[in-house]
Amino acid sequence: LVLSLLLITWLLESLGIDLNAARWAFSPSEGWPLGEQQPWKWIHRYGTIPGFLLTLAAIPAWFFCQRSQRYYASRRYVLIYGLTSIIGAGILVNALLKEHSGRPRPRDVVEFGGSWEYRDALDFGTPGKGRSFPCGHCTMGFSFSVGIVFWQRSRLLASGMFFLGLFYGALVSVARVTQGAHFVSDGVWALGVLMLTLSVLYYFVFKPPLSEKQDFSPMPAKQQRRLFSGILLAMFVMTGLYITRRPFYQDFQKKFTLPLRAESLLLQTNLEKERFELVPLDGKSPMIHLEGRGFALPDTNFRVDFSLPKSGDIPVIRLELERNGYFAELETRV
């Protein structure tokens, strides 16, 4: 499975499919017009709900199987289905890889009007500087494919869910490409991470075929409550860590002009002077480039107030940074 993913990734990069697919959806004059049309707009807004609800339903379904003699043999299959989406989609894709891979989205790269450099799928960059790899929305589309886990119980159900997931996940992937939010390889790896997670849980952790013939022995109610409380606590802790230790990156660039005979500058700022570095531009237009990185809650950012107020003989540059939201840590460099 890993070799297949690496081979597909190599082919996508060698043939230029990632950039070519984005070029197909991009218009230099309009941006990403396809992404604003239906059904792509609807899929972006509501497309994750079916997969999320099915994943959510897997936990109470597992408790039901634990207490039902008829469905007792299916308990581990149901548990694997739920955990694959929680671990693969929730933790590995959205909490770890997306936040730390540092791959800019198509709409953020220079080729499509952005300011960041394009990176290949496995060419990891600065954490927080782009959250393209893998595609989070796509994992919820492909999550139906995890139903292949039920092959031993019902081949019709398993194959139906698998192909439904492939179709729906591909549909979500196309929607995200049309919106300039993801490359094709981001969708491929969304499916890949889910299948890798499923394989580990199935073959190395739970091994459900070995438990099918076990006698019916329902878990005591007290033990079930403890287990359920433990799962809730673990999810609460992971959510807290995710939202407070989420990598953050934002930059600001601005070109400006100075009087030809200016020999000095006066800088007015609320940033520490140790954060500034002067770089010779070899005759190019003066430019200020501010980078901010750290850890912050979702939807947190900063606003940069840059101006050149008129003064006497010495040119003045005014640069102030205003934080919007909660930063657990923020380091700036100008």
Question: Where in the sequence are the language-model features?
Answer:
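Membrane-embedded catalytic cores of phosphoryl/pyrophosphoryl-handling enzymes
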Residues: 119-227
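Residue-level signal for helical boundary/lining positions with a hydrophobic bias
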Residues: 85, 98, 133, 182, ...
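Juxtamembrane "helix-exit" motif on the non-cytosolic side of transmembrane helices
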Residues: 67, 174-179, 245-246
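Short hydrophobic/aromatic residue motifs in ordered secondary structure
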Residues: 105, 140, 189, 275-277
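Alpha-helical transmembrane segments
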Residues: 56-65, 199-207, 239-242
